[in-house]
Amino acid sequence: MGNAALRRLAMPLAGMAVALFGQHGLAQTAAPAGKLTIEINKFEEIDGGGCRAFFLFQNATGKSFEGFEMSLAIFNKDGVIDRLLSIDAAPLPVARTTLKLFEIPQITCANISEVLLHDVPVCKPQNEANTDCYPMLDLKSRTSAPLEE
């Protein structure tokens, strides 16, 4: 089959893929190629105090991660660090979106003004050495508190 025939075949298939992904909203939320998108999707108050954070991890890096730990600084409405949290989000499979829930104790969701990604002490692709993840991170938040680097 020649290049022209392949192009004629590929164009309708590409159009169908766009139509299918667009129909379900997947194309708009896909992580940029080569990136690991970390999104705070929502906060939810915990009965008895505290805030539950829903994190989405979209792994478009081409690698699965067997180790991924974050150190987060939680700022209150006064701009003061309320607490530091260490979060283990592994495993993060390649080409998947993973939901992880983490509890932030003793602070209401409404009192969280910012979440700072302070450090990523563990970023270990499967069967590889620990690496610097910062260049591949894409941080987002759908909450009133931005996720910053």
How should each PLM-predicted stretch be described?
Residues 28-50, 54, 143-147:
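Low-complexity, acidic Ser/Thr/Pro/Gly-rich terminal tails and inter-domain linkers that flank the onset
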Residues 57-61:
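Asparagine-centered strand-capping/turn motif at beta-strand->loop junctions
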Residues 119-149:
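Surface-exposed edge beta-strand/loop patches
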